[in-house]
Amino acid sequence: MRYAKGSLVISPERDIPLLRQVRNSKFVSHHQLFELMKLGGFDHSRNSFNWRVKRLLDSGHVGICQSVYGAGSAVYRITKDGITLLEHHGQFTAVLHSNTEHLPHLSQVFHSLELNAVQLALWRANLLAGWQSEIEIASFNTISRAPYQKDYDAIVDIWIGDRKVRFALEYERILKSLKQYERIRAALEAERQIECVLYLTSGMEVLVHLVHEFQSVRKRLAFADAAAFERHLLDTVVTGRDGITARLWDVLQ
């Protein structure tokens, strides 16, 4: 089949997974996106990937964040046209769709990039069995009769031997207000579908504060520095809400 010169031909096997990843990540760097596509089995050639991204940028389905520096490569986000195209291919979410007034704010860039880095670290180590993004979780919570109590940053399935283990993941880059933590404590107490919540933090000061905020929550909680987790993964030494430390491997057993 021949196409008109300059027309954009969308590949359901290559373009749609890429657009879906950009949407679900909220923000993703060029390097991260290539690795996510490669590990997902969608694109193994960097030249092919670069060409694909350029097409989607030129067509306005993906946008580049011009004012973001320090990410190591260009940072992308989905556009309204990109969301509309995803919906045309059956990829709808209840919380980020073509009628959504505001797209994710630039203030969330480095939060999103860190979550991408965590996902990639688990994937490279062949530990990742499943990853549901905040977009997917929030969409599920909107329409489900049995929602999770919180829109977690991710719900993660990992392999421990031949067994799958699930936990909720939260990344705390900056501290929230006392009122927000009060609501979060109530949500964690009420959660029945998730047995363990792993809080990764941007530094030890945030970690210590979180342990203090959540020490009364009757839930299996673990706290760790995000950079340490990316290095050690299941061998990361985590702190419980009671201040006792253990390897994450043992906490998840």
Question: What is each model feature region?
Answer:
Residues 1-97, 101-102:
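Nuclease-adjacent, charged terminal/linker segments that flank catalytic cores
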Residues 3, 16-19, 175-183, 190-253:
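Non-catalytic C-terminal interaction segments of nucleic acid-processing enzymes
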Residues 99-116:
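A short, highly charged nucleic-acid-interacting micro-segment common to nuclease
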Residues 37, 53, 57, 86, ...:
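Hydrophobic, Leu/Ile/Phe/Ala-enriched alpha-helical segments that form helix-helix packing faces
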Residues 48, 110-114, 180:
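Soluble or luminal CAZymes and related metallo-dependent hydrolases
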Residues 65-66, 107-110, 119-167, 173-177:
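Active-site metal-binding core of divalent-cation-utilizing nuclease and nuclease-like domains
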Residues 26, 60, 126, 192-195:
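Structural motif
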